[in-house]
């Protein structure tokens, strides 16, 4: 069976994360597998929320010349998961960036020049570029300023991965009109979660 101590640690972590995010865990279900059908704990969640009145950001508002910013270094989570699983014989102490993003997103809603924002989870920041191209016909030019921690880059260099495609679970990518970028970065730099925020690219007509 599964150790009670480990289960208690998981539940405590869940409670802490819910408190930090300002959400309630309203329901739950458990299932016990027969021996040999699986090991450990599998967690799946469904979030239910309410769209705030007047919230305008949408991919359709993105325009040529808009600027992309990110709240912090990319690829931490994807790399941390690989190291935790000890895949490819690699080990390390890199910590996942997993965390609530509401403190990052809410302040930007007051900016008229906010076009769109999203967390770069599955597929990383590169997937956001692909989605923008598919939805709007506009491309993304990423700049050399994209922040990647040295341990993340080292793992990617060894394994042939691109950090732009690695998942981030506590970051936000925001797209803004050029004259609102400085205001957005100032807001993020005033938060612990956004102190490493930087500009990372520009929207341009697809070539």
Q: Which sequence ranges carry the predicted segments?
A:
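Helix-biased detector of long, well-ordered alpha-helical tracts
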Residues: 1-207
